[in-house]
């Protein structure tokens, strides 16, 4: 084995071990097992001709439905599960070791890509294992392994490879490693899943077109009067479909052309991961081009070291006498006698109580939150405030305004973990008050952005979202330690409840949510806030 292959293997193995040691893995596997149960129970169903035809429940059909479910979920959420491979090196303080190692950037990134792909396949594989176990428990015997696993290899593996490569490339590209990249990917993932249904997909990542064509041929061969249409119906149903006509289908025909196209997606993912080495900074601590330009412009240069001539600090006052530096009349006859009350005696006890100043704490949290936002974000916020006052009745403006503070909300509970200041906050005099102040800042920002719609447009229902969303961000950040959990949950709620105008999940006053929805979000806000504030700090 050459040195490059050895480095690739050990990089992938080390990163995969780190991912598998994550305490959240068990919850993710449990969710995948439950999804396997939903597939077998008929709650996640694939039908043709307006939900009139479905395949016979054999291994090929169940394996295809399971593979489509896994590929769909990996496309939407896999990015957020594998993102952070490079930031984990920075937070773990192993970045200098990687930067100084002889491993090439291409080899290092390919190792990260391999481990992320395998991690997603572990999650998807748990769905396949659970489906096989449930088959046995229902007394139907062990399903045939080849028809069950063939769609998994054809459709899930390429999806996992491409999603991991995109996540790695976003981390290497400047400006896309944070919340902005997560938002852009979410819209791209939705487009990748919707475009095949509309017949306008240049690349069929999930393989929907191939599966539909194969099923359509089987339906027409057994039911000539049927019209399969442009695409099948695939989704979650509260109750299994009844009185459906079944057709026998033995799976997608594996041809050389199909294998070449699906393998090409895997190779494209590897090429994208290798190409990410071009913008990859290899954890270079040198300042960015913005900092370099700022230092070249006229103005105060904060990088200039202070000397005795340039220092603005006052001279040191008298300190306690030491053996090496005698003070007082005995040590220096020409020195004045020290004051009767030495300066260090004015420090007082470190255990003296500190008065809580709520407004001062809120102002500090507000400065911390806004200081981390870019100038573009702040200008956009001002534009949204002005637009809200100009056209307060626009629901489209509401949808955009509810998306704009996402970077701020995602930092509410995860900021201390990312900056390694969580122990300091936990040992401060009022850690719970600090969390309440952070939530208040998260509520004040959307309140300012939505001032026009709230005061002039009559969208008072948005107030429940003002209370709920920052509580969700604070609780999710404190639970996971990263912004990814909140980003996943919130983007789904935003897309379904606001962008898709589903009143049952509307928290932003867009679709006129019923009273039950408003009460539910209000209770959820109270529970999440109390839990996030009172939960003890964990290292």
Where are these regions (language model features)?
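Aromatic- and glycine-rich beta-strand/loop motifs that create alpha-glucan
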Residues: 1-32, 284, 289, 294, ...
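Terminal transmembrane helical anchor/hairpin motif
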Residues: 43-55, 182-275, 279, 484-539
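Secretory targeting signals
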Residues: 30, 36-48, 52-72, 77, ...
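Transmembrane alpha-helical segments in integral membrane proteins
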Residues: 73-90, 161-172, 260-283, 456, ...
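Hydrophobic multi-pass inner-membrane translocation pores used for secretion
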Residues: 372-374, 397-398, 402-409, 413-425, ...
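Helix-loop-helix units of permease transmembrane domains in multi-pass membrane transporters
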Residues: 21, 81-125, 409-448, 452
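Juxtamembrane/interface segments at transmembrane-helix termini
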Residues: 87, 91, 198-202, 277-292, ...
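Transmembrane helix-boundary elements of multi-pass transport/secretion proteins
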Residues: 13, 17, 23-95, 353, ...
């Amino acid at each position: 084995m050459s040195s490059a292959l050895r480095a690739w293997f050990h990089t992938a193995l080390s990163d995969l071990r780190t991912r598998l040691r994550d305490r959240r893995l068990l919850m993710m596997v449990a969710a995948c097992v439950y999804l396997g149960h939903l597939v077998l129970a008929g709650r996640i169903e694939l039908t043709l001709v307006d939900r009139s035809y479905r395949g016979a429940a054999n291994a090929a059909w169940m394996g295809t439905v399971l593979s489509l479910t896994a590929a769909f979920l990996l496309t939407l959420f896999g990015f957020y599960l594998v993102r952070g491979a490079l930031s984990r090196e920075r937070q773990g303080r192993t970045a200098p070791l990687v930067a100084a190692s002889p491993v090439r950037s291409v080899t290092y990134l390919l190792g990260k890509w391999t481990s992320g792909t395998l991690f997603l396949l572990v999650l998807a594989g748990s769905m396949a294992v659970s489906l096989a176990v449930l088959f046995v428990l229902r007394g139907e015997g062990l399903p045939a392994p080849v028809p069950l696993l063939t769609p998994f290899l054809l459709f899930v593996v390429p999806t996992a490879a491409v999603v991991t490569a995109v996540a790695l490339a976003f981390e290497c590209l400047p400006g896309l490693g944070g919340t902005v990249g997560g938002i852009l990917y979410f819209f791209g993932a939705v487009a990748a899943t919707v475009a095949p249904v509309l017949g306008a997909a240049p690349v069929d990542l999930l393989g929907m077109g191939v599966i539909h064509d194969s099923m359509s041929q089987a339906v027409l061969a057994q039911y000539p009067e049927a019209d399969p249409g442009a695409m099948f119906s695939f989704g979650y149903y509260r109750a299994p479909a009844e009185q459906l006509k079944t057709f026998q289908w033995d799976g997608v025909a594996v041809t050389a052309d199909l294998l070449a196209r699906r393998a090409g997606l895997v190779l494209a993912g590897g090429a994208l991961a290798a190409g990410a080495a071009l913008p990859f900074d290899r954890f270079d601590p040198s300042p960015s081009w913005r900092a370099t330009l700022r230092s070249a412009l006229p103005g105060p240069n904060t990088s200039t070291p202070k000397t005795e001539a340039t220092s603005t600090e006052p001279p040191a006052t008298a300190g306690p006498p030491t053996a090496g530096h005698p003070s007082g009349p005995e040590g220096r006859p020409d020195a004045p006698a020290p004051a009767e009350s030495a300066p260090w005696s004015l420090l007082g006890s470190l255990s003296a109580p500190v008065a809580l100043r709520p407004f001062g704490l809120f102002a500090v949290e507000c400065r911390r939150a806004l200081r981390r936002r870019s100038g573009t974000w702040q200008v956009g916020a001002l534009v949204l405030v002005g637009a809200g006052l100009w056209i307060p009745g626009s629901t489209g403006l509401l949808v955009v305004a509810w998306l704009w503070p996402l970077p701020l909300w995602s930092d509410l509970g995860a900021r201390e973990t990312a900056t390694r200041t969580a122990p300091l906050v936990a040992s401060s005099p009022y850690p719970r008050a600090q969390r309440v102040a952070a939530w208040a800042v998260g509520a004040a920002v959307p309140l300012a952005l939505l001032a026009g719609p709230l005061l002039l447009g009559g969208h008072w229902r948005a107030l429940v979202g003002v209370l709920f969303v920052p509580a969700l961000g604070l609780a999710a950040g404190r639970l996971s330690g990263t912004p990814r959990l909140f980003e996943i949950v919130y983007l789904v709620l935003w897309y379904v409840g606001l962008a898709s105008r589903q009143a049952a999940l509307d928290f932003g006053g867009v679709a006129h949510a019923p009273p039950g929805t408003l009460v539910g979000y209000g209770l959820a806000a109270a529970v999440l806030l109390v839990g996030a504030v009172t939960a003890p700090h964990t290292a």
